Amino acid sequence: MEITKDTIKHVATLSRLAFNEEELDKFTDQMGSIINMADQLSEVDTEGVEETVQVVDRDTVFREDIPEHWQGQTRETLMENVPEKANGYIKVPVIINKDEDE
């Protein structure tokens, strides 16, 4: 599969990203290298090699989702490290603007 500058532009548009010409050239080369590596892997003879789903011989272990209290830490001391706060909450930048979707 050949990766062209148009392919990168298309994916960038779908991702709502904007790249200049230098970045397009760089990403086209990088993605081309990645795809070439994947193509090389598909040429490896795996005849007789048993399929592997998980390389570690153990089941997935989940812990209970229980909040842990950090010794000596309070909500106030943790909030001291927050760059922006509003009404006692952490203030983060807007990611999705509902006005843009309408």
From Swiss-Prot:
The keyword Nucleotide-binding applies. GO terms for biological process: glutaminyl-tRNAGln biosynthesis via transamidation; regulation of translational fidelity; translation. Keywords: ATP-binding, Ligase, Nucleotide-binding, Protein biosynthesis. One of its GO terms (molecular function) is asparaginyl-tRNA synthase (glutamine-hydrolyzing) activity. It catalyses: L-glutamyl-tRNA(Gln) + L-glutamine + ATP + H2O = L-glutaminyl-tRNA(Gln) + L-glutamate + ADP + phosphate + H(+); L-aspartyl-tRNA(Asn) + L-glutamine + ATP + H2O = L-asparaginyl-tRNA(Asn) + L-glutamate + ADP + phosphate + 2 H(+). SUPFAM superfamilies: Glu-tRNAGln amidotransferase C subunit. Its EC number is 6.3.5.-. The keyword Ligase applies. Transmembrane segments: none annotated. Belongs to the GatC family. Heterotrimer of A, B and C subunits. Allows the formation of correctly charged Asn-tRNA(Asn) or Gln-tRNA(Gln) through the transamidation of misacylated Asp-tRNA(Asn) or Glu-tRNA(Gln) in organisms which lack either or both of asparaginyl-tRNA or glutaminyl-tRNA synthetases. The reaction takes place in the presence of glutamine and ATP through an activated phospho-Asp-tRNA(Asn) or phospho-Glu-tRNA(Gln). This is Aspartyl/glutamyl-tRNA(Asn/Gln) amidotransferase subunit C.
